[in-house]
Design a protein with these regions (language model features):
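Glycine-aromatic micro-motifs
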Residues: 1-207
Length: 208
């Protein structure tokens, strides 16, 4: 009979209800941190999932589960192993002061940063509450991942356009109709369209 295995959860599998459904015989051992790592959200642009990556000085709060062989096989299916996530052993500093080694799922490195769905964030945040973990780590991870995703999209857009510098001497002002009254009218129409009290926001972070 195969020995039981310790599994390190940092995302949606912190959620006690979800784990009870996925792995009915799994047993929660305790909580701790994975040092020198950070929590990230990667995958599809509008449906990213949690993963962890090396980051000097970082710390990811985790829960440690004891799995039977049937539990691990079930998680392999849910986590998309080995195509979406791979496994490795990782040290965990438990809250009781002990250091253990457990199996963790890590997303394949080809994936880019993305935005997690509202439902997924709710599942993970409930897990954080279940295990009494530091919610600020989750919030910071969402902000950082969304910011990196936005930077990635901006870079792709800029590189695809290929901006060219144009000299003022390339224009013949004689061919340009400079109608000051028309310009002012167009400007007034533009600001009337926006409205004085209109507030423009640009936030990708899902609300909880």
């Amino acid at each position: 009979m195969k020995e039981k295995r310790l599994y390190v959860a940092y995302g949606s599998n912190l959620n006690l209800y979800q784990m009870k459904f996925r792995c009915p015989t799994a047993k929660l051992i305790g909580t701790g941190i994975v040092k020198d790592h950070e929590l990230q959200f990667k995958g599809r642009s509008d449906c990213a999932f949690a993963t962890i990556a090396p980051s000097e000085g970082g710390a990811v709060p985790v829960a440690v589960w004891e799995l039977k062989e049937s539990d691990e096989k079930s998680l392999d299916r849910y986590e998309g192993f080995p195509s979406h996530y791979f496994k490795q052993e990782i040290p965990v500093e438990m809250n009781n002061g002990k250091t253990i080694s457990g199996m963790v799922y890590i997303m394949n490195l080809r994936q880019s940063f993305g935005v997690p769905s509202k439902g997924y964030v709710q599942t993970v945040s409930e897990g954080y509450r279940n295990c009494r973990l530091d919610m600020s780590v989750l919030k910071d991870a969402i902000r950082q991942s969304v910011s990196r995703y936005a930077d990635l999209i901006s870079d792709r857009l800029i590189n695809s356009i290929g901006f060219e510098q144009i000299s003022l001497f390339d224009f013949d002002t004689a061919d340009v109709d400079l109608d000051e009254d028309s310009s002012e009218a167009d400007e007034d129409e533009y600001f009337d369209f926006l409205g004085e009290d209109e507030e423009i926001t640009d936030s990708f972070i899902p609300t909880q």
